[in-house]
Structure formats: C-alpha cells, structure tokens
Amino acid sequence: RDPEMSRGLGDVYKRQEYPHAGYGGMFRRWLHAENPKPYGSFGNGSAMRVSAAGWLFDTLDKTLEMAKMTAEVTHNHPEGIKGAQATAAAIFLARTGHSKPEIKRYVEQTFGYDLNRTCDEIRPTYHHVETCQETVPEAIIAFLESVSFEDALRNAVSLGGDSDTLACITGGIAEAFYGMPQELRDETLKRLPEDIREGYELFRWNIGQR
C-alpha cells in the first residue's frame, strides 16, 4: 500500500470540492479515518478508477503493478485487485494494437473471467451489483461485442445494473481500441469543471511525453 497515494486521495476529498460525487459509505469512512487503511473491498470502484494505469506505462508488467497499487489503497481483496488489473491490462493491450480475440484470450487465461457470454444472454438476469467479479467481465464483453466507441457504451448501458460503472470500464477499453470521436470528447469536456479539465489536459500531455 502506498501511503502517499492514500494521503492524496484523502486530501482531495477533504477539500470538499465535490461533496455529492456519490462516494460509498465504506469509502467515506476510510477518508475520514485518522490513519486510513485498506478495507478488504472487492467493489467495482477499483476497476472504475484504474483506466489511467492502462495508458501511462510502457510494459504490461508495469501496468499490472500500478493497477494493483491503485486498487489496494482501498480495495485490497484479491477480487478487487483482479478487477483493476484486468481492466488496465485490457486497456494496455487495446492501445498497443492487440486484437479483440487476443485481449479476450489474455483476460480469460490470466484472470479466469468467463467472456464467452453475449450481451443478449446477460441482460435478462442481470441486476444492480457492485462487485468486480460481476461487473468487470460484463463490461469487457460489452466492449468485445462493439463496433465503435459509442456502440461499446450503448452495449454497456443496455445491460442495466450499475450502468455508470459498466460504461466507465467499457469506455476506457473502447477509447484505447477505437479512439474517441472528437465531438463526444468536446461535449464531455464542456461539462467538466475547470480543475478537472486541467487534470485531463495534464494527463494527455503526460501520455504524449511517454
């Protein structure tokens, strides 16, 4: 666990710039703790927030290492770490020119997720669930079935359940694979507060300097 990362997360929250951003109860308690420690979560938040790790590093091994680090600050259950690593690995493979069959095979063999279902098979019985093991595979399947960035997001949202998290995970992989249409990028950026836009621009600059 990286204490600097823990403090950084806590400091951002305690500035109270976004008090209604939908933090979970366990996360709120973690942030207010005097000495915050991981709380054994296998929730899908670790996968939802990991996409940057898939972009910033030059090797898959380093990507997996950093995905683990970002997860275990809070989500140190093996399933929480696995969900973050699978998502980051899929993004890394997508942005480095690997095909969908290659991405699917790697995720299945490395993390043991079942990616042989279809969105049509998932929808009838899917429900709101916030675990990595019942969110990350479905999000990856939504990407695998897609034909474009927007189609991937539509697939993810169409599953129901924790749709914003599904779309976040799917969208991270889809952008790495397809790119993001400029009109969607522009519209999204217009809706963000200035400080978050500045963070985005710094992130894009860092990617360009790799």
Set out the residue ranges of the language-model regions:
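Active-site flanking loop/helix segments enriched in acidic
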Residues: 28-42, 48, 71-72, 118-130
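A cyclin-like helical interaction fold
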Residues: 83-148, 152, 199-210
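Single conserved hydrophobic/aromatic residue that forms the stacking wall/gate
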Residues: 1-13
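Catalytic phosphate/nucleotide-handling subdomain of diverse soluble enzymes
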Residues: 59, 67-73, 86-89, 139-209
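Short, well-structured alpha-helical segments that form the helix of a local strand-helix-strand
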Residues: 11-16, 63-68, 100-113, 151-157
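Active-site nucleophile and cofactor-binding loops and adjacent substrate-binding regions
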Residues: 38-45, 80, 131-132, 160-163
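Phosphate/ribose-phosphate-bearing ligand recognition and processing surfaces
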Residues: 40-42, 60, 64-83
